[in-house]
Amino acid sequence: MRRTFKIFSFLGVGSFAIASLVYWVLQGNGSNGHVFGAWYRMFGYHYEHPYQYIAVVCFTYAATGTLGTGLWPHVAGWRRRGFITGILIFTVLAASIPGGVLWKIHDMEAGYFTKGAQFWNDLLWGAATGLETGWLLTLLSFPYNLICFIIGYRLTAHGFRISAAPAKN
């Protein structure tokens, strides 16, 4: 259990700190403040609250990375590389769901609030829309996506090393 918590903390806090730093550097260096991809005429809530969206992805990554490194700690060679790539791709898809819900919550804060049963339908719509479009918005977020993919790969590889290390008493 301690090892699982250690890996989750390492992946979650490490990825959030590094992804936030990468965002901060890119946002301040010539990208006109546009680090993330967006649809034409899309409300830019991810520009108003970037660290919330980064946190959603990072802690989804921490959960999937911890699960993957814990279940198959001794995967090696090309299988490990493929497995790490799979964890990162799955993270994008899985994080798109809560990311869509968060976008819908920010939409409600902007004045588009619904009541009663429609509230839950709107959140479900946000989850479905996030799953449909989140991966594409991630692809449009170049070079942020590439830098974070490389960092995520290295962090996950280290998570595998932590998971495969002999237990200390």
Task: Locate the predicted segments by residue.
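Juxtamembrane/disordered regions of integral membrane proteins
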Residues: 1-169
